[in-house]
A protein has these predicted regions:
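A short glycine-rich, Lys/Arg-flanked "PGG" loop and its adjoining helix->strand segment in the class I
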Residues: 157-172
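Class I SAM-dependent methyltransferase SAM/SAH-binding core
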Residues: 86-133
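A short SAM/SAH-binding and catalytic strip from SAM-dependent methyltransferases
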Residues: 143-156
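Conserved Class I S-adenosyl-L-methionine
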Residues: 215-297
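Short alpha-helix
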Residues: 198-213
Length: 297
């Protein structure tokens, strides 16, 4: 398949861009003979990592994604967080948030967010499900945030369209410059002899937005690293599961992590911690008569 040039801009053929995005994401499928050899799902979501990260960014909000959403909430307004996790995107916005709706596929993640929001005096409306399937249920908001979800969306055009339609003021997307699991590629080669994909990328998403006629701004920056894991053993276990390796290979995984430069005293997630990320924002096209609703604070 001919690969479209992500830098081609609005003239790039949207159909080709969308097909390339789908094909690249499909390339991340793990061969059945590898997944069949283990009992645990490799698509693990380390909930404690999400919780620690949400707590850290809530304590000291910073970065372009926060700044764009914060500015759009002047005057205060409602927030819809798509793929909320434990709340790293929306919790820092609570001081200017009049109503919070949170969408996630994982009930455990919604519970983590609700616990933290309610501790701050906000009762969120929780919408379990996949975006954009639950877009109608989630409704509209002044600001829509969506952090580190786009690489899960094979059908990216309706995903982006629904974000735009849901926002009265602004959509703010945050994503890593390249697929977050790229950092595991050397380990897949080491343990399975498997060459993993390198795409898609944030540049490709920007090209898709342009081809859709959406004028988006973007800013690249490095997200500060932090102590995402409580211990090196926890990082080792999550990495082992992600690599479809049995428990008796934990020592081998630990050795590989150390060989890669991971400091056991400061275990960080191999996904997006300390990595270059891109904040992307564009105007929503939700109805101008959107009511921000009664405060749920």
């Amino acid at each position: 398949m001919t690969q479209p040039d992500p830098a081609a801009g609005p003239e790039a053929d949207l159909t080709d861009l969308l097909e390339h995005w789908r094909a690249e994401l499909a390339g991340w499928a793990i061969p059945e003979q590898i997944t069949a050899a283990v009992d645990e799902s490799p698509w693990v979501l380390p909930r404690t990592v999400f919780a620690r990260r949400a707590d850290r960014v809530s304590a000291a909000p910073s970065g372009p994604s926060f700044e764009r959403a914060w500015a759009a909430l002047d005057p205060p307004g409602s927030v819809l967080d798509v793929g909320c996790g434990a709340g790293a995107a929306c919790l820092p916005l609570l001081p200017r948030c009049t109503a919070l709706t949170a969408v996630d596929t994982e009930a455990d993640m919604l519970a983590l967010l609700a616990e933290r929001a309610e501790a701050s005096g906000t009762r969120p409306r929780l919408v379990p499900g996949t975006w954009p399937d639950v877009a109608a249920t989630a409704g509209m908001a002044d600001v829509v945030t969506c952090h580190h979800v786009t690489y899960n969306a094979a059908r990216i055009e309706p995903f982006l369209t629904a974000l735009t339609d849901a926002a009265s003021r602004l959509v703010v997307v945050e994503m890593t410059s390249s697929h977050p699991l790229v950092s595991l590629n050397p380990f897949w080669l080491r343990f399975h002899g498997l060459v993993r994909p390198s795409g898609p990328t944030a540049d490709e998403l920007l090209a898709i937005l342009a081809a859709m006629g959406i004028s988006a701004g973007h800013q690249r920056w490095n997200r500060p690293g932090g102590r995402d894991y409580g211990s090196f053993a926890e990082l080792t276990n999550v990495t082992r599961i992600r690599l479809c390796l049995p428990p008796d290979r934990a020592d081998d995984v630990a050795a590989a992590l150390i060989d890669s430069g991971i400091d056991p005293a400061h275990p960080v997630d191999l996904g997006s911690s300390g990595r270059e990320v891109v904040t992307i924002w564009w105007d929503g096209r939700g109805g101008n008569d959107l009511a921000t609703g009664a405060s749920n604070r």
